[in-house]
């Protein structure tokens, strides 16, 4: 599901709320989540999961075109850990 599909679905379910207001709310929520992660803070949504940053250590990579070795710096990457409720709901398809 893309962001626009999410907005469309939410707007369809909440017909009393203008679609533009739903779009603004979704964009604002995602912006706040991104800003919170950028500050190094963890986000926890009970029953859904948690977002945090994980550190990736420096390593030697490889240029796929030339095959040359490339030094890659360490960096922080976003990480999502699903909550128990979400894992249980997803397992009905597994």
From Swiss-Prot:
CDD domains: IHF_B. The keyword Translocase does not apply. The keyword Transcription applies. GO terms for biological process: DNA recombination; regulation of DNA-templated transcription; regulation of translation. It holds the Pfam family Bac_DNA_binding. One of its GO terms (molecular function) is DNA binding. One of its GO terms (cellular component) is cytosol. InterPro entries: Hist_DNA-bd, Histone-like_DNA-bd_CS, IHF-like_DNA-bd_dom_sf, IHF_beta. It comes from the Bacteria. Keywords: DNA recombination, DNA-binding, Transcription, Transcription regulation, Translation regulation. SUPFAM superfamilies: IHF-like DNA-binding proteins. Belongs to the bacterial histone-like protein family. This protein is one of the two subunits of integration host factor, a specific DNA-binding protein that functions in genetic recombination as well as in transcriptional and translational control. Heterodimer of an alpha and a beta chain. This is Integration host factor subunit beta.
